[in-house]
Structure formats: C-alpha cells, structure tokens
C-alpha cells in the first residue's frame, strides 16, 4: 500500500542523483542504472518516479540502505549520513542519457 505522503512528494525529491562509479558504469552494459534515492521511498515510488522523469519502462529495482559511516576531523568525531541506493533495470531498447553529448 502506498502512503498518501508518497503522492505529495515530487519525483525530483525521490531521485536525488545518479551514481557514477566503476561498478555503475559496468552495469550500464546490462541496461542497469544506479541512483541515490530518498531513504524513506519504496520500490513502487522509485519506479513511478524513474518512469515519469525519464520516460522509460522499468523492469526491476534492487534497493539497499547503506549504513552511516564515522568521519573524523582531528579530535572531533562525526557521522556521514545513511543513504539508500537503487539499481534500476530498464527494458530492452530504453536508455537514460547520463552523459551529455557535446
């Protein structure tokens, strides 16, 4: 069941930014894209946001919540925030242009 608060959030607030790492670029060959998403969003809202923003068909979504990490600056100890990552598999023929063509 989808909460009514999920409908009120815009798609741009759910999808924060794409992940560009070595592993993420290898996954592009399999038509899989990685995004950092809102911690409290679920797979249904992520799917609808991706389909709305990029006009593509989503087949599968894998999500994981990564733990917060300790960060140290001198004698002071702080924490990097916890975040959620989504790996989105698109249907055959659909692409998301992450790199601009110049």
UniProtKB/Swiss-Prot annotation:
Where does the protein end up? Plastid, Chloroplast
Q: Which ranges of the sequence are coiled-coil?
A: none
On whether Ribosomal protein is a keyword of this UniProt record, the answer is yes
The principal location of this protein is plastid
Question: Which PROSITE patterns does the entry mention?
Answer: RIBOSOMAL_L23
* The organism's place on the tree of life at top rank: Eukaryota
Any Gene Ontology biological process: translation
Indicate whether Ribonucleoprotein appears among the record's keywords.
yes
Gene3D superfamilies, per database record: 3.30.70.330
Quote the InterPro entries the UniProt record gives.
Nucleotide-bd_a/b_plait_sf, Ribosomal_uL23-like, Ribosomal_uL23/eL15/eS24_sf, Ribosomal_uL23_CS
- A cellular component term, taken from the record's GO annotations: chloroplast
Q: Name one GO molecular function term.
A: rRNA binding
Q: Which key words tag this protein in UniProt?
A: Chloroplast, Plastid, Ribonucleoprotein, Ribosomal protein, RNA-binding, rRNA-binding
Q: Which function does this protein serve?
A: Binds to 23S rRNA.
What the record says about family reads: Belongs to the universal ribosomal protein uL23 family.
What do we know about how this protein assembles, alone or with others? Part of the 50S ribosomal subunit.
The protein depicted here goes by the name Large ribosomal subunit protein uL23c
Q: Which gene encodes it?
A: rpl23
């Amino acid at each position: 069941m989808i909460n009514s608060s999920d409908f009120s959030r815009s798609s741009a607030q759910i999808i924060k930014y794409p992940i560009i790492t070595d592993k993420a670029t290898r996954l592009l060959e399999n038509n899989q894209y990685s995004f950092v998403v809102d911690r409290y969003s679920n797979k249904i809202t992520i799917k609808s946001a991706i389909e709305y923003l990029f006009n593509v068909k989503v087949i599968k979504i894998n999500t994981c919540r990564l733990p917060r990490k300790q960060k140290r600056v001198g004698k002071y100890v702080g924490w990097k925030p916890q975040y959620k990552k989504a790996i989105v598999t698109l249907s055959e023929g659909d692409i998301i242009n992450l790199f601009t063509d110049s």
